[in-house]
């Protein structure tokens, strides 16, 4: 900690510890904040020793300036370095908020001085600030190397996303205004995916050969004061120097070798993305339970990888987005009409596939099923052509109503036989057994018992005869025939014992 905190000593350290972290706050800067800043610089591949001087702080702020829209930690690092710069320059600031404001004022004043110096030298053109090629105070076009932050961001995108469709716009944004040398630096930082990089090199070589075919080199010596025309390998940065690239890009008329080379790289990246994303836009279909928003995200992600013109992509969006939706969303989208915007589609299909939509669909299905079942029951009742049941009152004996609704005086006793002492459910009058015979019978025992059989009063005599058969009585046989009709047990089970 002591080695990293040695950037300040004596009066500078006292001034550092008087600056507040927030406007009106109690906490102030300490040595630990310098230690934290040095650690963060290591993450961005910047030299920690730059914190020891004001010029080093300026160089750090130039590298961090394009990334101020990043994370909170990155903004805190920039503000800490700006505060440290004010301490080195002995600029009095009360808190962290005043330090970036002072740095911004100094930058504006320096730019005005550079422009004024250029005008005094007879150059009426404004100073070019097109990064990475800028014009210095002497009017010379100089190149600023690509920042480590840009390279780090590009490497992270390739590592995390591989070669998904969003890599192409990220590369285009990070390489804005870059020279062929800067573009080659970005490509060389990619460690893995060498098969993809070889495909990219093949595409670049093909485009360079096509450029040489369309733009043949001028024969003979080049007139003095003119620059040679770039070849395909010059545009790719293999046979041209950085100064030649700057002259081509800043000449009048300019030859944008950086933009041409960038188009070649993007063309190769499109081929790689198509290889890494083999799914066709025709195969993107919404699942039965997939939310419409997730389906749209997958659709447009695959659409970005398609090699087609903007008109064709517009037709795909208008046609396939609705055609490949699930039946629920397709019904809603077709009801909106062909001129519906994506926002209207997203709003109309919001909630389709979610719990509330599932519950609503289930309730509708159950109501339809119950309605169909009720209709079937009514049809069965209406089509039933059996004998109509006659309702008869047990109290008065009339038809058309039940006994509980009868207005006549309540009859005493059994409603079936008229006798008192028991109820109708206990009445045995004219009760038939399972053979259909009225029970109790006036002829004695019920029909399902043996008739005219004397009950033994003592155990039967022991019989020691084997194989003896008892001959049936010839006199009893006709009586049994009379007692047992066709519905008797004898007719069902054969001879009774």
Curated annotation (Swiss-Prot):
Region feature Interaction with membrane phosphatidylinositol 4,5-bisphosphate, mapped onto this chain: 72-76
ZnF locations on chain (CCHC-type): 391-408, 412-429
Site (Cleavage): 131-132, 362-363, 378-379, 433-434, 449-450
UniProt KW keywords: AIDS, Capsid protein, Host cell membrane, Host cytoplasm, Host endosome, Host membrane, Host nucleus, Host-virus interaction, Lipoprotein, Membrane, Metal-binding, Methylation, Myristate, Phosphoprotein, Repeat, RNA-binding, Viral budding, Viral budding via the host ESCRT complexes, Viral nucleoprotein, Viral release from host cell, Virion, Zinc, Zinc-finger
Chain spans, region Interaction with membrane phosphatidylinositol 4,5-bisphosphate and RNA: 14-33
Region ranges (Interaction with host AP3D1): 12-19
Post-translational modification: Gag-Pol polyprotein: Specific enzymatic cleavages by the viral protease yield mature proteins. Capsid protein p24 is phosphorylated possibly by host MAPK1; this phosphorylation is necessary for Pin1-mediated virion uncoating.
GO CC annotations, alphabetized: host cell nucleus; host cell plasma membrane; host multivesicular body; membrane; viral nucleocapsid; virion membrane
GO-annotated biological processes: viral budding via host ESCRT complex; viral translational frameshifting
Residue positions where Asymmetric dimethylarginine is found in the record: 388, 410
Gene3D superfamilies from the UniProt entry: 1.10.1200.30, 6.10.250.390, Human Immunodeficiency Virus Type 1 Capsid Protein, Immunodeficiency lentiviruses, gag gene matrix protein p17, Single helix bin, Zinc finger, CCHC-type
Compositional bias of kind Polar residues: 108-126
Protein family per UniProt: Belongs to the primate lentivirus group gag polyprotein family.
Additional note from the record: HIV-1 lineages are divided in three main groups, M (for Major), O (for Outlier), and N (for New, or Non-M, Non-O). The vast majority of strains found worldwide belong to the group M. Group O seems to be endemic to and largely confined to Cameroon and neighboring countries in West Central Africa, where these viruses represent a small minority of HIV-1 strains. The group N is represented by a limited number of isolates from Cameroonian persons. The group M is further subdivided in 9 clades or subtypes (A to D, F to H, J and K).
Name of the molecule in the record: Gag polyprotein
Species the sequence originates in: Human immunodeficiency virus type 1 group M subtype G (isolate 92NG083)
């Amino acid at each position: 900690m002591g080695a990293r905190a040695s950037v300040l000593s004596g009066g500078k350290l006292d001034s550092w510890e008087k600056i507040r972290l927030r406007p009106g706050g109690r906490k102030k800067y300490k040595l630990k904040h310098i230690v934290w800043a040095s650690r963060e610089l290591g993450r961005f591949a910047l030299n920690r020793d730059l914190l020891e001087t004001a010029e080093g702080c300026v160089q750090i702020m130039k590298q961090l300036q394009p990334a101020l829209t990043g994370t909170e930690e990155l903004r805190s690092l920039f503000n800490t370095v700006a505060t440290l710069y004010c301490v080195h320059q002995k600029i009095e600031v009360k808190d962290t908020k005043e330090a970036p404001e002072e740095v911004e004022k100094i930058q504006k004043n320096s730019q005005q001085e550079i422009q004024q110096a250029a005008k005094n030298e007879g150059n009426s053109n404004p100073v070019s600030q097109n990064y990475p090629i800028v014009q210095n105070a002497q009017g010379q076009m100089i190149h600023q190397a690509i920042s480590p932050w840009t390279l780090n961001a590009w490497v992270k995108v390739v590592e995390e996303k591989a070669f998904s469709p969003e890599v192409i716009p990220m590369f285009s944004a990070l390489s804005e205004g870059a020279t062929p040398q800067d573009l080659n630096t970005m490509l060389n930082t990619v460690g893995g995916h060498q098969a993809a990089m070889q495909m990219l090199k093949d595409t670049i070589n093909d485009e360079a050969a096509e450029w040489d075919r369309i733009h043949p080199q001028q024969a003979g010596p080049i007139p003095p004061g003119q620059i040679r025309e770039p070849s395909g390998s010059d545009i790719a940065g293999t046979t041209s120097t950085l100064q030649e690239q700057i002259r081509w890009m800043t000449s009048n008329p300019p030859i944008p070798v950086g933009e041409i080379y960038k188009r070649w790289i993007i063309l190769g990246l499109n081929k790689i993305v198509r290889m890494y994303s083999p799914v066709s836009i025709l195969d993107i279909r919404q699942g039965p339970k997939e939310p419409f928003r997730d389906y749209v995200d997958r659709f447009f992600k695959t659409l970005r990888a398609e090699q087609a013109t903007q008109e064709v992509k517009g037709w795909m969006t208008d046609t396939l987005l609705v055609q490949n939706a699930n039946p629920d969303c397709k019904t809603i989208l077709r009801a909106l009409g062909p001129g519906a915007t994506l926002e209207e589609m997203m709003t109309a299909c919001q909630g389709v596939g979610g719990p509330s939509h599932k519950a609503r669909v289930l309730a509708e299905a159950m109501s339809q099923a119950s309605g169909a079942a009720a209709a079937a029951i009514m049809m069965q009742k209406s089509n039933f052509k059996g004998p109509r049941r006659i309702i008869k009152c047990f109290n008065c004996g009339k038809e058309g109503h039940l006994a509980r609704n009868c207005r006549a005086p309540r009859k005493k006793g059994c409603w079936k036989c008229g006798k008192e002492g028991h109820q109708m459910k206990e009445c045995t009058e004219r009760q038939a057994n399972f053979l259909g015979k009225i029970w109790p019978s006036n002829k004695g025992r019920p029909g399902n018992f043996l008739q005219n059989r004397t009950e033994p009063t003592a155990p039967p005599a022991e019989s020691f005869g084997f194989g003896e058969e008892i001959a049936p009585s010839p006199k009893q046989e006709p009586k049994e025939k009379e007692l047992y009709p066709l519905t008797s047990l004898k007719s069902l089970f054969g001879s009774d014992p």
